[in-house]
Amino acid sequence: MQQVSEWYESEARVEGDGFWLRVHGDSMTAAAGMSIPEGTLVLFDTGREPKNGSLVIAKLVDANEATFKKLIIDGGQKYLKGLNPAYPLIPIDGNCRIIGVAVQTMMNLV
């Protein structure tokens, strides 16, 4: 079990276990519309059912870390998509497990 290094409070309604992760990288940074830049804290809910358009944390089978992406469901096929259009769609075909759905963000402005 990993040691907890920081505690954050939230009034968000969480249906399962909740945990915060800090965004690393620019795959969720967009030039227009919703953007979640590097350094932002995101609260994930493990008990919430992911839907089309949900922002999710997922563990890819062949990766050592989790990925934070938007879930796209199109014609029965599921994909993970960054908000940054420079990143490709990741087809979901048994190659990942969705761990939780994002319910809140928190970031410092200075």
Tell me the role of every PLM-derived stretch.
Residues 22, 43, 67-70, 101:
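Residues located in well-ordered beta-strands
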Residues 1-62:
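A short, contiguous structural element within a folded domain that forms the immediate neighborhood
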Residues 51, 66, 97:
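Charged, alpha-helix-enriched surfaces in structured cytosolic catalytic cores
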Residues 54-78:
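Short, compositionally biased
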Residues 72-110:
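Glycine- and charge-enriched low-complexity intrinsically disordered segments
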Residues 31-33, 54, 66-68, 81, ...:
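Short acidic, gly/pro-rich beta-turn/loop elements at beta-sheet edges
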Residues 37, 64, 86-88:
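Short, surface-exposed beta-strand-loop junctions and turns on beta-sheet-rich folds
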